[in-house]
Amino acid sequence: MSSALATQPEPAPVARVSRLRLTNTALLAGACAVLLLGPLAFGAVEPWSIFALEACAMLLLGVWASRQWINRELNLSGHVLFRPMAAFFALAVVQWLAGTTAYRHVTYTHLLLYAAYGMLVFVVTQTLRRSSQFDLLAKLFTAYGAVLASFAVLQGMAPNGKLYWIRTLEQGGYIYGPYVNHNHYAGLMEMLTPFPLVLAATHFTNGNRKIAAAGIAALMAASIFLSGSRGGMAAFVAQMAVLGLLLVRKREGGWKQPLMLGAFLALVIVFLVWMGGNELTRRLISIHSEAREEINGGVRLAIDRDCLRMLIKKPFLGWGLGTFPIVYPEFRSFYTTFFVNQAHNDYLQLLVETGLAGFSIAVWFLVLVFRQAANKLNNWTETASGAMTVAALLGCVGILVHSFLDFNLQIPANAALFYVLCAIAASNPLQESQRRRVVRRRSLIVESSPETAVS
C-alpha cells in the first residue's frame, strides 16, 4: 500500500493547470519582450524592425496555437475589442481587394502591420489572467522605463547628434532616447509612467519599494518635459488630471492619496529644476507664442485644412490605409521643401485614410475601452484588476490627447503598445491569488479597525 502511494503520479488536472500557467507566463513574457524591444529599434520604423515585429508576433501566435493543438482543446477567451478590431481589418481588406486605395501595395504592407498588432493583442488577452502576472508586468515596465529614461536624460545632457551616440541620422530629427523624434519618446513614456505611479499609489508596494516606485515614476515623467515635447507635456497634464479625479472620487483614505499625488508632482518639479536648465524654460515659454502662430495660419493648421479637403473627395472609405504621404502632395496648399509624411494629427489621418467608416469603427473601439474599464474602477487601489486597468487607461489617455498634435500611432512600437494597453484596460477582471486575497483582507481589516473601535 505504501509503495503504491509513493509512486502515485500527480493528478492530471493539477499538472495540466501548472503547465498551462507556465506556458501563459512564457507567452506573456515573449509579448512584453516584443513590445519593449520595439522602441529600442528606433521605434520599429525601419523595414528590418517592422519585419522583426511582424515575425515575432506571428511566432507567438504560432506557439499559442501549437499549445492548443497539443492539448487537443481550444482554450479561448473572448474579448470585447475583438469585434471592432476585426471590423477595421475587414475594412482595410475591402480597400485592398476592391482597389479603392490609392496605392494597393502600401495598404497591403499596413494590413500586415495591423495584423501583427492584432496578434500581440490576442496573445496578451489569452495569457494575462492572474494578479501575479500583473505584478510581473508592472515591475517589468517600471524597470524598463527607469533604464530608458535614465539613458534618455543622460544622452540629452551630453548629445552628439547620433542615436545611441553611434548612428548618424540619414535625415533631420530631434533625437531623444532611442527615437529620431522626441515626440515619440514622450509618447512611449506617457504609456509607461502610469505603471510605477499606480504601484506607488496602491497597496501592491509598501515602504521603500513604494518610495522607489514613486521616484522612478517622477524620473520618467520629468523626462517627458526634458524631451521638449509640448504634446507630451499636455498629455501628461491630462493624465494627472484623470488620476487626480480617480483619487478624489475614491472615498476611502480621505485626502491621503490626493496629497501623495501632489507630493509626486512636487518631486517631478524638483527633477525638472535640477536637470532642466534654460532649454526646458525656453520650450515652456514658446508654447504660447507657437500656439498663437499656428492659430494665425501655421503649417499644422494648413495640413488640417488640407486633410478636410481630402476627406471630402473620399468621405466613406478614404484613400487607403497608409496612403497619406502618397496622396497628400496633390492637396498641399503651401510651399515647403520638406516631405510631409504624416498629418501630425492621428484622428485626421485616420479620417483621410479610412474615411468615416474607419473613424466610426475607431470610435466604437474607444467607447468599448472606456466603458469596460469604468466597470473595474471600484476599489481600484485594492485589487490587481483595478490597478492594472487604471495604469493601462492612463497610458491610453496620454496617447489619445497627444494624438491631436503628433503621430505616435503611426510609429509601430508605440502603436503596438497602445493597442495592447487598450486591450488590458478593457479585459475581464484578473484571478487574484490566494495570497493576494489574504493580504488585501488584512489591509482592509487594519484600515477599518479604528472605526470598529469607535463603534
Model-derived regions, located:
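TM-adjacent membrane-interface loops and short helices in multi-pass inner/ER membrane proteins
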Residues: 181, 292-294, 299-341, 347-350, ...
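Extracytoplasmic loops and strand-loop junctions of Gram-negative outer membrane beta-barrel proteins
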Residues: 104-107, 288-293, 383
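Flexible juxtamembrane loops connecting transmembrane helices in multi-pass membrane enzymes
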Residues: 169, 174-178, 236-240, 258, ...
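Interfacial transmembrane-helix boundary/kink motif in multi-pass membrane proteins
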Residues: 75-83
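Canonical alpha-helical transmembrane segments
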Residues: 61-75
